[in-house]
Amino acid sequence: MKVRCLYNRGEDLRLFEYKPLIKDMIGRFGATGYTEYNELEIGKEYLVMGLIFFETYQAYLIDDNGLISTCPCQLFEIIDSRVNTANWHFRIMDKTENIYPFIQAILGYYELCNDKKAYEKLIIEKEEEACQIYFKRKIELEKEL
């Protein structure tokens, strides 16, 4: 799946809130009206490496210039909806996991879904091995598209 960035500010996410919020309130995306997604470039295309189902929203797992992050889907438009079903996996979080209930489920490459600590290693701890696996899988996916 490929997406194009339309927005990179928390203020833009206000359109998708369930109720009106003042600018300094944290909304369902974990962002205020002042939040900036500096890792995103408006108009740029991104290859989606996974979908993260947070408690109150969904996010794409993407990278920009080597910086891996999860960003709310509402910041993008889908430009290629094809998903590699042969190599993508799905996992529902167990309530005993540290990331539950904040993350409910993950859809993505094998290691992301089958290692219970993969999300933490990749996004929170930024472990080198987890990042290497991410980019290895990205290269494989780019060859298929």
Q: What are the residue ranges of the model-derived segments?
A:
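A short macromolecule-binding patch
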Residues: L67-I78
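N-terminal acidic leader/helix
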Residues: R82-H89
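Short aromatic-glycine-enriched beta-strand elements
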Residues: E55-L61
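Conserved beta-strand/loop element in small beta-rich adapter and peptidoglycan-binding domains
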Residues: E39-G50
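SH3-family beta-barrel domains
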Residues: M1-T32, H89-E144
